[in-house]
Amino acid sequence: MPGNSFGKMFKLTTFGESHGVAIGGVIDGCPAGLEIDTESVQNDLNRRRPGQSAIVTQRKEPDTVEFLSGIFEGKTTGTPIGFIIKNANQKSKDYSHIKDTYRPSHADYTYDEKYGIRDYRGGGRSSARETACRVVAGSIAKQMLKSVSFNAFVSSVGKIELNKDYSELDFSEIEKNPVRCPDPEMAREMEAYIKEIRGDGDTVGGTVQCVIKNVPIGLGEPVFDKLHAELGKAMLSINAVKGFEYGSGFEGTKMRGSEHNDHFNTDGSTQTNLSGGIQGGISNGMDIYFKVAFKPVATLMQKQQTINSKGDEVEMQGKGRHDPCVVPRAVPIVESMAALVLADYYLQNKSSKI
């Protein structure tokens, strides 16, 4: 199974399944001499951890990262950084009823058809549990990019949308509520709606917006490796993601060029930022901002019609512990994938000219 690695110079390879002994990863290409704050890495993991509030899955995992190599006396050695996160709270029996049944809109059918075998326990390799490894690597990437800030937050849940420009928001409010919305009033409304959805045995989608500040000019490569293209790939690789837009996004299609152009100031900055901090696939020093769309979780506590591996029509109902809405826990994942992209291009940019 290829496709388990991300990045060129700052490269992450992950391994493990949802109900296996552990998940883990190897980070290759991290420069030597970088001081690593392992407590900060763990704090980022805690933000993604299941069971942290009443509106997420109640699977209880400590998600404690254990570094195996590449860090000595608090600094990177330049060798591969290996780490594992042990799985502690698997309940594989919750999935015995889907051993031969395909859950609608899950990876069950496609994995079975492609590989002829699948780990049905929690989705195996297709589970979002794998994203914990991305958070570890992304946290280290953020520490390498010390001057760059990454702030992701929930901007909508279902039809409840935060209609404010990010410049009007106080990012310090993000972690003060379980939804991770920086507007306290909207956060309460979103939280109540998620609880209502959970009570119905249903799920709901939403969006996560990310704002990256103090980005160096020059990150990204022309043509096929544009910065926004790699950000899009990174975000679309996250479980349940259905869409990605940056800068003016689809709203830009409704504007005239005379309205959309970002005019320069004499210092090279721009008076507006509809480009989203990227021009010609290369960062221009302005804020990079984008939005990621997440679908409703496919596992429902309601009865659904589906088929089994023999092609027979059957009825199934979800069991186990699942998120009614993934966006609150997706916030640190979005930040981490953005950090991996920028860290990779930061190292590549070091070789762009002599």
UniProtKB/Swiss-Prot annotation:
SUPFAM superfamilies: Chorismate synthase, AroC (SSF103263). CDD domains: Chorismate_synthase. NADP(+) binds at residue 48. GO terms for cellular component: cytosol. GO terms for molecular function: chorismate synthase activity; FMN binding. Pfam families: Chorismate_synt. It catalyses: 5-O-(1-carboxyvinyl)-3-phosphoshikimate = chorismate + phosphate. Belongs to the chorismate synthase family. NCBIfam families: aroC (TIGR00033), PRK05382.1 (NF003793). This is Chorismate synthase. It comes from Christiangramia forsetii (strain DSM 17595 / CGMCC 1.15422 / KT0803) (Gramella forsetii). The gene is aroC.
